[in-house]
């Protein structure tokens, strides 16, 4: 069966969320995008939508999943439904330093200042980060976003 590597860093990192749209997806390993920052941009609903921007000195962690090609359309529809489109051209790097081409989605909107992450997105990101054992510092950073007084 043909499949596609998918890098999840936002709400579809949550094992329940990805299983809803791609029941055949299997988690392979954790990885990161070097020189990349997690941002939250305005979405159609006006909430902080997770996305990525290239920026030195930052790293974004996530999980790489093997998604059956027959389910890529449903995953794409779900990501687009949240306001993201395919199009991140940076290779994900695993813990051994290997680089991987992955299907990755970023917000349609360009970064336009700092926005508070939407609670549902952030909760899913934290659940997934904990579940897949992403680095503790990354998980703590996500948790801190929900407690940041600048976003209150």
Predicted segments, located by residue:
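Glycine-aromatic micro-motifs
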Residues: 1-152
